[in-house]
């Protein structure tokens, strides 16, 4: 008589492990043909044991259990009453594409977690993959009366924790998340608070901690760049950029900021391909000239790359959202309801330059984003004259600037757009 035993466990993350399963096994069947429903998403190793009385054979199978909500576009959006929603546009399978089917979940947070609401949504962030191939958190920050940060499992949107920042640091809310970092002590995203200080949001414990050496810095904005799989955090105010260490949070002093004393920072962008470079767009205080600086790879020194007088108003300001791509040596940004394309070392487009993209009449650009494969640019818009939902998403090809797809009137005013990639 042949005996069968099906069991499963979690994968052993060590590449040198002799056995592929970590920890205990759960036996789920002794039938030749297995029928079993998993109740949790995740990665598993299934083991089949076959015993004919004379020999025993083991076979192993890798299983990826998904929720059906594992890939698509996320749009954080807010209405006139400051009620925010996280809308999810599920990526279609080839079969669904052929049928023309589309799944849009207007309020994915409330659908999965009844009773959980977002007020005054500010920022949205998905952490990078960790060593086991999973990303630990999807987080949404808000400017509600508690400074709430909502943490969810990005695979299925299940609530992990609602952290009320103001209960730990009175009067403080998160203005922006600033990229992902990891060290021997954990994984975290940096963020800047409304008090001008820098904080660390721990993605393992879902807690927040003040970086004490930043208490009196008065930073106004956060920016993060990515190069390969590395993230770089930058916090800045009028003429000073702070670049905290990327490994251990306390290994260097953030207070030793890199100063551009004679200039006022307009915006900055981290190059996505070629070499690791931070470009800083400034105005010289003495003559209002536009000056482009390239920051060194150590982020401590500047090289002036372009210095010119403004003959026409520059089509860029501190509110321009900068979007880079590995597919091009150029980047995109928005200004005055248009999208411009810019080559880092060249002059900034002016208000009379031809834009790369102009949205349909009546649409006001509120934010930009990009697809995970970096082939597409997302343009979030708001049309106050539209009935019903006033927000839309337009998707353009990075290379050609052609419109690929539009979703009109599906959200309120878009605040942040991200692509949630498959685990």
Please identify what each model-predicted range represents.
Residues 14-17, 94-106, 156-162, 205-212, ...:
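Beta-strand initiation motifs
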């Amino acid at each position: 008589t042949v005996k069968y035993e099906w069991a499963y466990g979690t994968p052993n993350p060590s590449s040198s492990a002799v056995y592929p399963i970590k920890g205990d096994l759960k036996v789920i069947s002794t039938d030749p043909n297995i029928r079993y429903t998993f109740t949790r998403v995740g990665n598993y190793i299934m083991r089949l044991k076959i015993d004919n009385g004379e020999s025993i054979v083991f076979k192993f199978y890798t299983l990826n259990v998904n929720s059906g909500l594992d890939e698509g576009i996320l749009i954080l959006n807010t209405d006139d009453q400051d009620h925010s929603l996280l809308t999810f546009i599920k990526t279609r399978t080839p079969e669904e594409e052929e049928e023309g089917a589309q799944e849009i979940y207007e309020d994915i947070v409330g659908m999965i977690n009844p009773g959980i609401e977002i007020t005054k949504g500010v920022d949205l962030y998905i952490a990078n993959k960790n060593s086991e191939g999973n990303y630990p958190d999807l987080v949404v920050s808000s400017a509600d009366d508690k400074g709430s940060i909502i943490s969810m499992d990005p695979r299925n949107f299940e609530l992990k924790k609602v952290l009320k920042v103001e209960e730990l640091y009175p009067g403080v809310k998160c203005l922006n998340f600033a990229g992902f970092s990891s060290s021997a002590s954990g994984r975290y995203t940096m963020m800047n608070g409304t008090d001008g200080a820098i904080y660390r949001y721990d993605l393992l414990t879902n807690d927040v901690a003040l970086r004490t050496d930043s208490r009196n810095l008065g930073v106004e904005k956060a920016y993060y760049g990515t190069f390969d799989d590395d993230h770089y955090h930058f916090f800045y105010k009028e003429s000073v950029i702070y670049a905290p260490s990327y490994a251990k949070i306390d290994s260097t002093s953030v207070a030793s900021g890199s100063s551009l004393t004679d200039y006022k920072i307009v915006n900055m962008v981290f190059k996505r391909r070629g070499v690791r470079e931070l470009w800083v767009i400034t105005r010289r205080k003495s003559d209002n000239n536009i000056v482009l600086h390239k920051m060194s790879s150590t982020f401590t020194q500047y090289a002036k790359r372009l210095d010119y007088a403004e003959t026409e108003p520059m089509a860029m300001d501190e509110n321009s959202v900068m979007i880079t791509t590995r597919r091009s040596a150029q980047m995109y940004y928005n200004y005055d309801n248009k999208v411009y394309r810019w080559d880092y070392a060249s002059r900034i487009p002016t208000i009379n330059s031809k834009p790369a993209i102009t949205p349909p009449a009546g649409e006001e650009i509120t934010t930009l984003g990009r697809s995970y494969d970096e082939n597409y640019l997302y343009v979030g818009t708001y049309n106050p004259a539209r009935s019903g939902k006033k927000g839309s998403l337009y998707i353009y090809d990075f290379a050609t600037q052609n419109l690929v797809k539009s979703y009109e009137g599906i959200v309120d005013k878009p605040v942040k757009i991200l692509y949630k990639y498959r685990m």
